[in-house]
């Protein structure tokens, strides 16, 4: 089981060596993350710094990447940590920008690390973060873990650590405490992502891409309500690719006489990426076994029971290779359906869902009814 600790650091040169303690075990270090790594036997370490640390090391501001590399190389020497570093755009003194750019950067780059390392357990250490760093880093990493757990169908444990308050001169041991511990399942990860989106003002997602103000809440609603056929058939891969392209670029660093402007992407890009990242789990033709698996993994108890009941009904009929509406088998009259019917049947309205058999598997599809389905979401 692979584990990782993400730790926010304000000034890599600003911490004295102390003795940290966790559950009676002690470790001497200038930063808490080394104690956590050693005492909790964590596999991987990621240090999160702000770009404003460039002033600590007199780094040149030619561009973000070279400035970032200067910070990393110097920080490795001061912290004694040679592993991964994330240098995020932050607001501090002459560095100007928006705090949520810090959030978005950490979300995207921590997600990439989780994917690469195949992580099952995450520790977040906010002991040395300054200003908003600890809070936003924790929220960004939780969003990344939620999206990662959902798409990869993993349960991931997340633990938050911080220390007792300390002054400049520390003579006693400093205790590190587990402030919070939760388990994020594929379902709870999915729900966390959709909650972040569906509770925002509608105009929050304006101008990300064409019609994003309507499309993003609609996709989030479909995901939240278990409309797995819609998610599989309504191609959203271009939205994900555009967001990947935007978020993978370095922030823009623009020095002037008295300040340095740092520009990246707003929080809405992180939330939108998390949504389409999870949705990318659903693609291709959906057979009944696949639909049942989606319901078992990603649907709440009520939606799961509805979908499984509808699948059980469909399995009783002898299907052919010709696509026919479910209503023809169910002997249900009427050609239309509304929002109530769509959700009451777990996304399988009899007048809007085709079924057919191919190579011993029964498939369900919206076919030419998908636009009508979309209008009801």
UniProtKB/Swiss-Prot annotation:
Keywords: Antiviral defense, Endonuclease, Hydrolase, Nuclease. Belongs to the CRISPR-associated Csx1 family. The keyword Hydrolase applies. One of its GO terms (biological process) is defense response to virus. InterPro entries: CRISPR-assoc_Csx1_C, CRISPR-assoc_prot_DxTHG_CS, CRISPR_assoc_ribonuclease, CRISPR_Csx1, Csx1-like_HEPN, Csx1_CARF. It comes from Saccharolobus solfataricus (strain ATCC 35092 / DSM 1617 / JCM 11322 / P2) (Sulfolobus solfataricus). Its EC number is 3.1.-.-. Homodimer. It is an enzyme of class 3 (hydrolase). This is CRISPR system endoribonuclease Csx1. PANTHER family: CRISPR SYSTEM ENDORIBONUCLEASE CSX1, CRISPR SYSTEM ENDORIBONUCLEASE CSX1-RELATED. The RNase activity is stimulated by cA4. The keyword Nuclease applies. Gene3D superfamilies: SSO1389-like, SSO1389-like domains. CRISPR (clustered regularly interspaced short palindromic repeat) is an adaptive immune system that provides protection against mobile genetic elements (viruses, transposable elements and conjugative plasmids). CRISPR clusters contain spacers, sequences complementary to antecedent mobile elements, and target invading nucleic acids. CRISPR clusters are transcribed and processed into CRISPR RNA (crRNA). Activated by cyclic tetraadenylate (cA4) to endonucleolytically degrade linear RNA; when cA4 levels decrease the RNase activity of Csx1 is abrogated. GO terms for molecular function: endonuclease activity.
